[in-house]
Amino acid sequence: MAIDIWDSDAIKELAGGWTDEEEQELIKDTRLREFTVEYLGRSWQDALKYSFLSADETNSGRYLRNIHMGDTIYCHIAGYGFLGIGICTSKAVYMKDFNVSVDGVSTPILKAPWINQDKKDQLVTEKEIFIGVDWKKSVPDESQGYWEKGMTSIPLVAYMLNDRTTHRKVAEHFGYQPEE
């Protein structure tokens, strides 16, 4: 009920205003976190090539926005397992605003040539959000995903696990050691 009467933009204006970047810096949690990102139905090869993950921001896809720069990401595809571990390098932005490196030139993802053009064509440009990922460990193909009995996955796009056992097993399997 309070959310219906609480207009954060009006409060911001009354208080003298501040930029979105200043607001994020104020509320930023400096502890780095670990997220699992579910990536079913999208091009894993292009995510590797262009260093990103994406999701439709409707429903649980909006949780991709909870991932901050520096957070660790464990990428999982249901039916295949864990495919990679990376570090988030940029906050979530809409597809039209996301750039990748093509032959050393910053290029909008919309204009970049994809390995799997059909998967790109299936994305709803106005709803798809992207984060940059520096892949530390990965497999080139979904069929090489890692999964074992007892591991945890949840049918949400981006989430944190209370029990770190799954992430520890994945890191060990991939030979991943976080940088200090």
Task: Go through the PLM ranges and name each one.
Residues 74, 87, 132-134:
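Beta-strand cores of modular interaction/reader domains in eukaryotic scaffold and signaling proteins
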Residues 63-77:
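Short coil-to-beta transition motif at edge beta-strands of beta-rich domains
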